[in-house]
C-alpha cells in the first residue's frame, strides 16, 4: 500500500515540476544571418568587412549575429560551393537574413577563374549552360534569379529576408561617388519589390556619406584598392545598414539595435 501511495502522488508531482521547468526555459535567441562577399567579411587585414563590426550596434544579449559572408564569392558561387546549404541547415523561423552582393558578378559567366563567378545581367529567367572541367553541367542564372532563390528559401524556413544594395566603391566622377543605380543596386531593389523582401539601399546611404567626405577623406578608408575598406570604413557601412533598417516601417530587426 505504501508503494502504491508513493507512485500515485509522486508521478503527478513530477509531471508538474517538468512542466514548470519547461515554462521557465528561455526561448532561443533569434539569429541575424548575413551573406555577402569580402566587403562584408574580410580577413586580409587591415581590410575589414562591415559584417565583422555590425554586432557593435546590436544588443547581442537578445539576438545573435552570424556573418556567413565569404571573400571572393558571388551569388552564384555562394550557392554552388554549398555555403547557402550550410545557412539553410540552421536558419529557423523568426530569424533574420540579409543578402548583399554585386562585386564579383560582373565577369561573363564561363569556366575561367573569373568567369566561374559571373552571372547573367538583370532579373529575368534567362539561363546559360556551362560544361565544367569535370564534365558536369552548370546552369547559370541572372543576378535577380539568385537573389530570389535566397529570399524564397529563407521565407520557406520562416525567416525574414532583407536585400541590401551593394557597397559602393571608392570611385568618384564629377565630385560624386558612382552609384549602382543602373545595375546591381537597381536589380536588388526590383527583386525586393518583386518578392516582398525588405530593402536597404546601402549603396545610396553610404555613397551620400562619401560625397560629404570628399575624395581625399574617402580614400583614407580604402587601404590598397578601391573596393575594400579598413575598419573605419567598415563601421561607416555597418552604420549605413542600421540606418537603413531604422527606415523600414515593419521590420522588427531594428528593435534589436542599441539606442543611439
Where does each model-flagged region fall?
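Positively charged n-region of N-terminal signal peptides that target proteins for export
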Residues: 1-9
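Short glycine-rich, polar/acidic loop-and-turn segments at beta strand-coil junctions
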Residues: 69-72, 103-105
Amino acid at each position: 500500500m505504501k508503494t502504491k501511495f508513493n507512485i500515485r502522488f509522486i508521478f503527478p508531482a513530477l509531471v508538474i515540476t517538468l512542466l514548470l521547468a519547461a515554462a521557465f526555459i528561455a526561448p532561443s535567441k533569434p539569429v541575424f544571418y548575413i551573406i555577402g562577399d569580402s566587403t562584408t567579411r574580410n580577413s586580409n587585414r587591415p581590410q575589414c568587412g562591415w559584417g565583422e563590426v555590425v554586432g557593435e550596434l546590436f544588443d547581442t544579449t537578445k539576438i545573435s549575429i552570424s556573418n556567413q559572408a565569404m571573400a571572393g564569392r558571388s551569388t552564384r558561387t555562394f550557392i554552388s560551393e554549398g555555403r547557402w546549404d550550410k545557412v539553410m541547415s540552421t536558419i529557423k523561423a523568426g530569424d533574420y537574413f540579409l543578402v548583399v552582393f554585386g562585386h564579383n558578378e560582373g565577369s561573363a559567366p564561363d569556366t575561367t577563374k573569373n568567369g566561374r563567378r559571373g552571372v547573367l545581367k538583370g532579373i529575368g529567367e534567362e539561363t546559360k549552360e556551362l560544361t565544367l572541367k569535370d564534365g558536369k553541367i552548370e546552369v547559370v542564372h541572372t543576378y535577380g534569379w539568385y537573389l530570389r532563390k535566397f529570399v524564397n528559401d529563407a521565407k520557406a524556413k520562416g525567416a525574414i529576408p532583407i536585400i541590401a544594395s551593394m557597397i559602393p566603391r571608392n570611385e568618384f566622377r564629377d565630385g560624386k561617388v558612382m552609384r549602382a543605380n543602373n545595375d546591381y543596386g537597381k536589380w536588388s531593389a526590383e527583386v525586393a519589390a518583386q518578392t516582398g523582401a525588405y530593402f536597404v539601399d546601402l549603396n545610396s546611404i553610404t555613397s551620400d556619406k562619401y560625397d560629404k567626405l570628399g575624395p581625399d577623406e574617402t580614400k583614407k578608408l580604402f587601404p590598397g584598392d578601391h573596393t575594400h575598406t579598413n575598419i573605419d570604413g567598415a563601421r561607416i557601412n555597418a552604420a549605413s545598414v542600421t540606418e537603413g533598417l531604422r527606415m523600414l516601417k515593419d521590420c522588427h530587426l531594428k528593435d534589436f539595435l542599441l539606442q543611439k
